[in-house]
Amino acid sequence: EEQEAYTYDVDKAKELMKEAGYEDGFKLTLWGDNTTQEIKGMTFISQQLAQIGIEVDVQPMEPATVSDKIYVDKEDAEINMWYVNWSASDFTMDGSLRSLLYSTMCPPTSANTAYFNDADFDKDMDEGLATANEEEQAKYYGDAQKIAWEACPWLFLGNDQIIYSTKSYLSGVYVSPDGAFNFANATLAQ
């Protein structure tokens, strides 16, 4: 099921900041990998948040350094924001959501850096994993996705479009959602 896109409303955001006691804004740190794409994304986020008084210190780092800083016990966590790309290489809803948002999948063993904890979300994830019926899976995972979208523990910004081509004599090449190429079934026409 498709979700309605989040709305862009600077005035509403300022109003919510005021209600939360942050009328004068605040400062935070945004971590991410030091690739050109990641730095551009983090810079864009910092520009957007500046409009509502949030001063962002963008800190691009080597991926291993980001990982070392992210995957620590909660009491040692220093994370404010993390700019990250994610895809489900296994092509399952469970793979898309469980490690990011399931209540027990927090650092240091997994990526729920929002420390999201929603019993209904967890129940839907468990029910989806427990059944082999595709219609039931679609319902449970759809419900879990709706909970995550509405709670917004992470801000889901967009989807990359992976475009690739092959020669007409090559078949069986597959590209996963994370951009990895799979040549296991590749064949060349004679």
Q: What are the roles of these predicted feature ranges?
A:
Residues E19-K40, E78-N85, T131-K167:
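Bilobed periplasmic-binding protein-like "clamshell/Venus-flytrap" ligand-binding domains
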Residues L30, L49, I70, L97, ...:
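Hydrophobic, well-ordered secondary-structure elements that form the walls
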Residues E1-D11, Y22, Y71-A77, R98-D126, ...:
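Short, solvent-exposed loop/beta-turn-alpha elements that line the ligand-binding surface or hinge
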Residues A50, I54, Y71, E75, ...:
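Hydrophobic alpha-helix feature that most strongly marks membrane-spanning transmembrane helices
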Residues G41-M42, M93-L97, Y169:
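Short, solvent-exposed loop/turn and secondary-structure capping segments
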Residues L30, V58-P60, P108:
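A structural preference for short, hydrophobic beta-strand core positions in alpha/beta folds
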Residues Q47-T104, Y140:
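Periplasmic binding protein-like
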Residues E1-Q47, Q51, D120-K123, K139, ...:
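Append "and occasionally in soluble cytosolic enzymes with long acidic Gly/Pro-rich linkers
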